[in-house]
Amino acid sequence: RQLYLDWIPQIMYNHHQSGPAGSVVAGPPYRDPFNHVYDPLVITTLDAVGAAMSSRLNLEGKPGYTQRNGSVFSTWFNGGLRTTTYFHNMVGILSEIIGSPTPSEVPLVPARLLPNGATPFPVTPRPWRYADSIAYSLSLNYAVLDFAARNRDALLFGIWRMGRNSIERGGRDHWTHYPRRIAAIQEAHARDNPPAKSGATEDDDSGASAAGRRRIPTRYFDDVLRKPELRDARGYILP
């Protein structure tokens, strides 16, 4: 009630612990694939807030932020404080940070030492104190608040636009694309166009390899993905 009826925030941030070994903190953007039932603006705004968080740490010389495939966190668990917000067109943030009142060390994890898209600024093995975790958490708070202050109009318009999108979707036929339905397009095309039995190899452009690379006619989109029985429900009537 407090979150969804009284406050109705545009961003909700949940601090949690602990982060993956060899990193300091895991946060957004989260790993692919994201839950494809969400409005795409939820995901892109989530990415933007995540970029502000990691950039703030980098600016302050605080390494160890990991994202996407650098952690196990996704947008698929529907029972958490952070993930339920997505169904209300809010940007739910979860960060998982290392540290506790007991001093510890950042362990050596060789696979995390090379900078990449998941961990642009790797942390090296070092002693870790609870004060370090608090300093990182404060920086992340300021990053989110600064982003919200600088993008106030965009966030307010965005949550309105997402709500409007939901209303419009409820007034017309709509289909959600699921992996199994995407695979059904390829299966239907393969059934209708079996590869030639000419002894062709994968490197032979005249045989099965070339058939697999041929463009699939757009009629398969309507035939498979736009079946009336696969339409999203416009509402549910409970007795």
Where are these regions (language model features)?
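Active-site/substrate-binding loop(s) of hydrolase catalytic cores
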Residues: 1-46
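Loop/turn elements at helix/coil->beta-strand transitions in domains of secreted/extracellular proteins
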Residues: 7-11, 54, 63, 88-91
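Soluble non-cytosolic domains of exported or imported proteins
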Residues: 40, 44-48, 128-135
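Acidic, glycine-rich loop-and-strand cores that form catalytic or ligand-binding grooves
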Residues: 49-57
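Hard-cation-handling environments
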Residues: 59-239
